[in-house]
């Protein structure tokens, strides 16, 4: 869960207090009146922001259609325990930047050796021959200390990929584990390559999603 802004926290606290007092969430108009918004539409925008941050759920077609999903939105540390799941990675941004985190999963990092630092959603079938399938969650230990033959999470220019590493002089080859995919050749003299970590385990997609 991303942290709430002060205004979002006020809206969340109002919703929770109204449910505690009356058993029902407030309407958009009631939120606007209580917090001094100019219109119910302003309250709606704050509710949408809270829904995106996964602290409430909005029920379409109901004026009081608001469900609270967490007991205490301010308790960010508790909400964000577990391994972060990384989704799409924006160009030029660190892989663990907050905007890349889709969710947190209650997985013990120490069950992997070395221990996992994050999960990466796998896209495509390029590593299927070693059991890394489309939609799986790849457990990754964040390090740049890698050896030939290890399966790595690499960033080539601005594209993130999972491949087996081979270094040859000033060139790096990123090999797929699927004969339908050609190796990715990286000339370190002309291209940017960043190793984000090594694969330390796989969680089958259907187990968690």
Curated annotation (Swiss-Prot):
Its EC number is 3.4.21.88. Keywords: Autocatalytic cleavage, DNA damage, DNA repair, DNA replication, DNA-binding, Hydrolase, Repressor, SOS response, Transcription, Transcription regulation. CDD domains: S24_LexA-like (cd06529). GO terms for molecular function: DNA-binding transcription repressor activity; sequence-specific DNA binding; serine-type endopeptidase activity; transcription cis-regulatory region binding. Residues 28-48 bind DNA. One of its GO terms (biological process) is negative regulation of DNA-templated transcription. The record marks 91-92 as: Cleavage. Represses a number of genes involved in the response to DNA damage (SOS response), including recA and lexA. In the presence of single-stranded DNA, RecA interacts with LexA causing an autocatalytic cleavage which disrupts the DNA-binding part of LexA, leading to derepression of the SOS regulon and eventually DNA repair. Homodimer. This is LexA repressor. It comes from Vibrio cholerae serotype O1 (strain ATCC 39315 / El Tor Inaba N16961).
